[in-house]
């Protein structure tokens, strides 16, 4: 039976994107059910019965419902190991998970001032970054440059889902014309060309 992915109706959630990419990479059959976050449909009692967090993404696999994007991707990776979403080497895998957790728990000023509709609806903003967002941007670029200092195409050797998450965060800055080192721009661009990522980027979207 096809799995069901609950997604935001405008397809701008970076967390839904991460799960979409994992399902697509693994060529798993799945359907998408949209939830209109603009009207708070995620707080409807019916959705709360399905989604413990009342957020998207939530994945339904048979009678099992799971929220939190990184938990979903790890679940998929254990249930359907091929192709893997994380490096096989333990320390590289830990690094990929660290990056995922870091991107989800930090960089709030960037997320607020450079929201994902600026990427997926190609509507860059002209407001300069606040001092807090500039500091977050410096931290992000320093960390990403350090992680990619090996000169390879991916964060942790082989491609992993953390590359998608990092490219998304960098693109928040890049598409809005904020300063990002050229090596990171090239990295984000290459990651963005991945067919599974393009499958999300090119989705038909409702008007903003
Ligand atoms: N940590 C969660 C974050 C999920 C999240 O923040 N989803 C947003 C959309 S991007 C949402 O559902 N917002 C609605 C709300 O919180 O009311 C994950 O990784 O899945």
Stretches with model-predicted labels:
Residues 1-129:
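GST-like domain detector, emphasizing the conserved glutathione-binding G-site
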Residues 200-208:
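Terminal-tail/helix-coil boundary detector
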Residues 31, 181, 199-200:
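A local structural micro-motif
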Residues 49, 193, 202:
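Phosphate-coordinating loops and pocket residues in cytosolic domains that bind phosphorylated ligands
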Residues 79, 99, 176, 203-204:
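Residue-level signal for well-ordered alpha-helical positions
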């Amino acid at each position: 039976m096809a799995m069901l992915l609950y997604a935001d109706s405008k397809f701008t959630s970076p967390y839904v994107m991460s799960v979409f990419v994992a399902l697509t990479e693994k060529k798993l059959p799945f359907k998408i059910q949209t939830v209109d976050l603009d009207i708070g449909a995620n707080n409807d009692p019916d959705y709360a019965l399905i989604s413990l967090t009342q957020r998207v993404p939530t994945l339904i696999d048979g009678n099992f419902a799971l929220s939190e994007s990184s938990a979903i991707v790890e679940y998929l990776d254990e249930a359907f190991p091929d192709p893997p979403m994380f490096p096989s080497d333990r320390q590289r895998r830990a690094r990929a998970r660290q990056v995922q957790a870091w991107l989800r728990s930090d960089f709030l000023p960037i997320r607020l001032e450079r929201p994902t509709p600026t990427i997926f609806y190609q509507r860059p903003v002209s407001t300069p970054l606040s001092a807090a967002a500039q500091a977050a941007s410096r931290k992000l670029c320093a960390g990403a440059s350090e992680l990619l200092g090996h000169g390879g195409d991916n964060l942790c050797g082989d491609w992993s889902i953390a590359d998608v998450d990092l490219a998304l965060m960098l693109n928040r800055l890049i598409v809005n014309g904020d300063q990002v080192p050229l090596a990171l721009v090239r990295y984000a661009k290459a990651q963005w060309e991945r067919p599974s990522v393009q499958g999300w980027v090119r989705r038909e979207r409702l008007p903003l």
